[in-house]
């Protein structure tokens, strides 16, 4: 039986991993075994952090809205509750941008939420 040589395939596989590990420090960019572990782990971190990024940005928007609404004497949860009762459909990303860049509109939204909170 003839011997099957797979050196071409193995070299291609190793080159692919080492190319992905380019820029890593020390043996992580030069040695296949260590580079493979680093590439796998970096993929896990990337997968996890793509999901965490969404949570972190939502937290940032909520913090910004809370800080801006407290300048007008209203807490974040009262603002959101008042806007929902007024049927104002605006997401937290847009609300945070309005709070930073368009203070007149934000103060109008605060007034609208305050009026609605007083009725209930």
Swiss-Prot record:
NCBIfam families registered for this protein in UniProt: rplT_bact
UniProt record similarity statement: Belongs to the bacterial ribosomal protein bL20 family.
Protein's recorded name: Large ribosomal subunit protein bL20
Keyword Ribosomal protein: yes
Organism: Blochmanniella pennsylvanica (strain BPEN)
Gene that specifies this protein: rplT
Keyword set, alphabetical order: Ribonucleoprotein, Ribosomal protein, RNA-binding, rRNA-binding
Functional description taken from the UniProt entry: Binds directly to 23S ribosomal RNA and is necessary for the in vitro assembly process of the 50S ribosomal subunit. It is not involved in the protein synthesizing functions of that subunit.
Pfam families: Ribosomal_L20
GO biological process, one term: translation
Classification of source organism: Bacteria, Pseudomonadati, Pseudomonadota, Gammaproteobacteria, Enterobacterales
S-S pairs: none
InterPro entries listed in its UniProt record: Ribosomal_bL20, RIBOSOMAL_L20_CS, Ribosomal_protein_bL20_C
Annotated Gene Ontology cellular component terms: ribonucleoprotein complex; ribosome
Example GO molecular function: structural constituent of ribosome
């Amino acid at each position: 039986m003839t011997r099957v040589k797979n050196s071409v395939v193995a070299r291609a596989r190793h080159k692919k991993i080492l190319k992905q590990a380019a820029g890593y420090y020390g043996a992580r960019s030069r040695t296949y075994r260590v580079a493979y572990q680093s590439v796998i782990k970096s993929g896990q971190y990337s997968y996890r952090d793509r999901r965490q990024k969404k949570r972190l940005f939502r937290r940032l928007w909520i913090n910004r809205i809370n800080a801006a609404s407290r300048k007008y004497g209203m807490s974040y949860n009262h603002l959101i509750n008042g806007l929902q009762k007024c049927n104002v459909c605006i997401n937290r990303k847009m609300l945070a941008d309005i709070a930073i860049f368009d203070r007149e509109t934000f103060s109008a939204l605060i007034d609208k939420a305050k009026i609605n909170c007083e009725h209930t």
